[in-house]
A protein has these predicted regions:
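Flexible, gly/pro- and Lys/Arg-enriched active-site loops
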Residues: 35, 50, 59-64, 81-214
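Nucleotide and nucleotide-moiety/phosphate-recognizing core
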Residues: 2-10, 16-105, 114-115
Protein backbone atom coordinates (compact mmCIF):
# COMPACT_ATOMS: atom_id res chain seq x y z
CA UNK A 1 0.00 0.00 0.00
CA UNK A 2 1.45 3.35 -0.99
CA UNK A 3 1.86 6.04 1.63
CA UNK A 4 -0.60 8.27 -0.25
CA UNK A 5 -3.39 5.74 0.29
CA UNK A 6 -2.38 4.37 3.70
CA UNK A 7 -4.44 5.22 6.78
CA UNK A 8 -2.36 7.00 9.38
CA UNK A 9 -3.58 7.05 12.98
CA UNK A 10 -2.07 9.31 15.62
CA UNK A 11 -2.87 9.43 19.32
CA UNK A 12 -2.70 12.82 21.03
CA UNK A 13 -2.85 13.54 24.74
CA UNK A 14 -2.31 16.48 27.10
CA UNK A 15 -2.77 17.23 30.80
CA UNK A 16 -0.89 20.49 31.43
CA UNK A 17 -2.54 23.89 31.28
CA UNK A 18 -5.47 24.23 28.89
CA UNK A 19 -5.30 20.69 27.53
CA UNK A 20 -8.24 21.13 25.14
CA UNK A 21 -6.60 24.13 23.51
CA UNK A 22 -3.31 22.24 23.29
CA UNK A 23 -5.04 19.38 21.47
CA UNK A 24 -6.80 21.79 19.14
CA UNK A 25 -3.52 23.53 18.33
CA UNK A 26 -1.81 20.20 17.69
CA UNK A 27 -4.52 19.16 15.21
CA UNK A 28 -4.21 22.47 13.40
CA UNK A 29 -0.43 22.15 13.21
CA UNK A 30 -0.67 18.56 11.97
CA UNK A 31 -2.81 19.83 9.12
CA UNK A 32 -0.01 22.23 8.18
CA UNK A 33 2.62 19.48 7.84
CA UNK A 34 3.61 18.92 4.22
CA UNK A 35 2.42 15.52 3.10
CA UNK A 36 -0.21 15.11 5.83
CA UNK A 37 -3.95 15.40 5.16
CA UNK A 38 -6.05 15.29 8.33
CA UNK A 39 -9.30 13.49 7.56
CA UNK A 40 -11.06 12.97 10.87
CA UNK A 41 -10.67 13.81 14.55
CA UNK A 42 -12.27 11.80 17.34
CA UNK A 43 -14.18 13.00 20.35
CA UNK A 44 -12.15 13.97 23.41
CA UNK A 45 -11.80 11.41 26.20
CA UNK A 46 -10.42 11.82 29.73
CA UNK A 47 -8.40 9.08 31.43
CA UNK A 48 -6.38 8.88 34.66
CA UNK A 49 -2.60 9.03 34.28
CA UNK A 50 -0.49 5.89 34.38
CA UNK A 51 0.94 4.39 36.60
CA UNK A 52 -2.06 4.37 38.96
CA UNK A 53 -1.89 5.80 42.51
CA UNK A 54 -1.16 2.41 44.08
CA UNK A 55 1.98 2.04 41.96
CA UNK A 56 5.23 3.36 43.54
CA UNK A 57 6.09 4.97 40.19
CA UNK A 58 2.91 7.07 40.28
CA UNK A 59 3.34 10.81 39.67
CA UNK A 60 0.50 13.02 41.01
CA UNK A 61 -1.00 14.91 38.07
CA UNK A 62 -4.25 15.79 36.34
CA UNK A 63 -6.17 13.37 34.15
CA UNK A 64 -5.21 13.27 30.49
CA UNK A 65 -7.41 14.42 27.63
CA UNK A 66 -6.97 12.18 24.59
CA UNK A 67 -7.99 12.07 20.94
CA UNK A 68 -7.12 10.02 17.88
CA UNK A 69 -6.57 11.66 14.50
CA UNK A 70 -6.99 9.79 11.22
CA UNK A 71 -5.00 11.16 8.31
CA UNK A 72 -3.41 10.25 5.00
CA UNK A 73 0.26 10.85 4.41
CA UNK A 74 2.61 10.97 1.48
CA UNK A 75 5.57 10.91 3.86
CA UNK A 76 6.98 7.84 5.58
CA UNK A 77 6.93 6.97 9.28
CA UNK A 78 10.37 8.43 10.00
CA UNK A 79 9.56 11.80 8.46
CA UNK A 80 6.17 11.88 10.15
CA UNK A 81 7.79 11.11 13.51
CA UNK A 82 10.26 13.95 13.01
CA UNK A 83 7.36 16.30 12.27
CA UNK A 84 5.41 15.25 15.36
CA UNK A 85 8.46 15.70 17.59
CA UNK A 86 8.85 19.23 16.24
CA UNK A 87 5.17 19.94 16.87
CA UNK A 88 5.57 18.73 20.45
CA UNK A 89 8.50 21.10 20.89
CA UNK A 90 6.51 24.02 19.47
CA UNK A 91 3.71 23.28 21.93
CA UNK A 92 6.01 23.32 24.95
CA UNK A 93 7.20 19.76 25.46
CA UNK A 94 10.81 19.34 26.58
CA UNK A 95 11.65 15.66 26.36
CA UNK A 96 15.11 16.14 27.87
CA UNK A 97 13.81 17.66 31.11
CA UNK A 98 10.45 16.01 31.59
CA UNK A 99 9.81 13.45 34.31
CA UNK A 100 9.15 9.89 33.23
CA UNK A 101 5.41 9.17 33.52
CA UNK A 102 4.97 12.82 34.46
CA UNK A 103 2.59 15.43 33.06
CA UNK A 104 2.77 16.44 29.41
CA UNK A 105 1.73 19.67 27.67
CA UNK A 106 1.31 17.49 24.56
CA UNK A 107 2.10 13.93 23.55
CA UNK A 108 1.77 12.72 19.96
CA UNK A 109 2.13 9.00 19.24
CA UNK A 110 2.26 7.47 15.78
CA UNK A 111 -0.06 4.49 16.19
CA UNK A 112 -0.47 3.11 12.67
CA UNK A 113 1.09 4.08 9.34
CA UNK A 114 -0.68 1.87 6.81
CA UNK A 115 0.90 -1.56 6.89
CA UNK A 116 4.36 -0.16 7.58
CA UNK A 117 6.35 -1.87 10.33
CA UNK A 118 9.32 -0.51 12.26
CA UNK A 119 10.98 -1.90 15.39
CA UNK A 120 13.72 0.49 16.46
CA UNK A 121 14.51 2.26 19.72
CA UNK A 122 13.39 5.58 18.24
CA UNK A 123 10.34 4.30 16.33
CA UNK A 124 8.05 1.32 16.73
CA UNK A 125 5.14 1.08 14.27
CA UNK A 126 2.47 -0.02 14.83
CA UNK A 127 2.53 1.23 18.41
CA UNK A 128 3.18 -1.84 20.60
CA UNK A 129 0.54 -1.03 23.24
CA UNK A 130 -2.50 -0.15 21.12
CA UNK A 131 -4.45 -3.20 22.29
CA UNK A 132 -3.78 -2.38 25.97
CA UNK A 133 -5.25 1.12 25.97
CA UNK A 134 -8.94 1.96 25.89
CA UNK A 135 -8.03 5.64 25.50
CA UNK A 136 -6.51 4.66 22.15
CA UNK A 137 -8.96 1.98 21.00
CA UNK A 138 -12.19 3.87 21.76
CA UNK A 139 -11.35 7.04 19.79
CA UNK A 140 -9.57 4.97 17.11
CA UNK A 141 -12.73 2.95 16.54
CA UNK A 142 -14.68 6.19 16.27
CA UNK A 143 -12.60 7.52 13.38
CA UNK A 144 -11.68 4.14 11.84
CA UNK A 145 -14.73 1.90 12.44
CA UNK A 146 -13.65 -0.82 10.02
CA UNK A 147 -10.02 -0.56 11.02
CA UNK A 148 -7.74 -3.57 10.90
CA UNK A 149 -4.32 -3.40 12.55
CA UNK A 150 -1.26 -4.59 10.60
CA UNK A 151 -1.28 -7.91 12.49
CA UNK A 152 -4.81 -8.59 11.22
CA UNK A 153 -6.63 -7.73 14.46
CA UNK A 154 -9.78 -5.69 14.01
CA UNK A 155 -9.84 -2.59 16.20
CA UNK A 156 -13.36 -3.45 17.39
CA UNK A 157 -12.30 -6.98 18.34
CA UNK A 158 -9.30 -5.61 20.25
CA UNK A 159 -11.63 -3.37 22.24
CA UNK A 160 -13.96 -6.26 23.09
CA UNK A 161 -10.96 -8.31 24.26
CA UNK A 162 -9.71 -5.43 26.41
CA UNK A 163 -13.10 -4.98 28.04
CA UNK A 164 -13.34 -8.71 28.73
CA UNK A 165 -9.90 -8.70 30.35
CA UNK A 166 -11.00 -6.25 33.02
CA UNK A 167 -7.97 -4.05 32.34
CA UNK A 168 -9.78 -1.33 30.42
CA UNK A 169 -9.17 2.27 31.47
CA UNK A 170 -11.61 4.43 33.37
CA UNK A 171 -12.34 6.44 30.23
CA UNK A 172 -14.77 9.37 30.15
CA UNK A 173 -16.27 11.03 27.09
CA UNK A 174 -15.73 14.79 27.39
CA UNK A 175 -16.91 16.36 24.13
CA UNK A 176 -15.42 17.52 20.86
CA UNK A 177 -12.64 19.86 19.84
CA UNK A 178 -15.15 21.95 17.92
CA UNK A 179 -16.29 23.14 21.36
CA UNK A 180 -12.91 24.84 21.84
CA UNK A 181 -13.21 28.61 21.23
CA UNK A 182 -10.59 29.14 18.56
CA UNK A 183 -10.90 30.95 15.25
CA UNK A 184 -8.05 29.06 13.68
CA UNK A 185 -8.91 25.41 14.19
CA UNK A 186 -9.63 23.84 10.81
CA UNK A 187 -11.27 20.55 11.61
CA UNK A 188 -13.17 18.13 9.37
CA UNK A 189 -16.59 16.95 10.42
CA UNK A 190 -16.59 13.69 12.31
CA UNK A 191 -18.97 11.34 14.10
CA UNK A 192 -21.40 13.10 16.39
CA UNK A 193 -20.79 13.24 20.12
CA UNK A 194 -22.22 15.16 23.09
CA UNK A 195 -21.03 18.74 23.19
CA UNK A 196 -20.43 18.62 26.93
CA UNK A 197 -20.75 16.46 30.00
CA UNK A 198 -19.13 13.23 31.09
CA UNK A 199 -20.19 9.67 30.35
CA UNK A 200 -18.35 6.40 30.61
CA UNK A 201 -18.60 4.44 27.35
CA UNK A 202 -19.65 0.83 27.68
CA UNK A 203 -16.59 -0.56 25.92
CA UNK A 204 -18.13 -3.83 24.82
CA UNK A 205 -21.23 -2.03 23.55
CA UNK A 206 -19.10 0.49 21.66
CA UNK A 207 -17.15 -2.27 19.98
CA UNK A 208 -20.18 -4.38 19.17
CA UNK A 209 -21.89 -1.42 17.54
CA UNK A 210 -18.98 -1.42 15.09
CA UNK A 211 -19.34 -5.07 14.24
CA UNK A 212 -16.84 -6.85 16.48
CA UNK A 213 -17.22 -10.60 16.79
CA UNK A 214 -16.02 -12.60 19.73
Amino acid sequence: MSAAHAPVLLGLGANVGDALTQLAAAVELLGDVDGVDVEEVSSVYATPPWPPPDDPRHVPQDDYLNIVVRARATIGPEELLASTLELERLLGRDREREQRWGPRPIDIDLLVHGDERRDRPELTVPHPRIAERAFVLVPMLEVWPGGVLPDGTRVAAALVALAASGHDDDILLVGRLEDVPTEHLLRPDGPSAPAAGFARPGLEDVAREHGART
